[in-house]
UniProtKB/Swiss-Prot annotation:
UniProt keyword terms in alphabetical order: Amidation, Neuropeptide, Secreted
Compartments (UniProt record): Secreted
Modification type Leucine amide: residues: 9
One CC-aspect GO term: extracellular region
UniProt entry tagged with the keyword Zinc: no
Family per similarity comment: Belongs to the FARP (FMRF amide related peptide) family.
Tagged with keyword Secreted: yes
Function: FMRFamides and FMRFamide-like peptides are neuropeptides.
Superkingdom assignment: Eukaryota
GO biological process: one example: neuropeptide signaling pathway
Protein name (database record): Extended FMRFamide-4
Amino acid sequence: GVDSSFLRL
């Protein structure tokens, strides 16, 4: 989800 994408940063 969105959280996963943010953690990838």
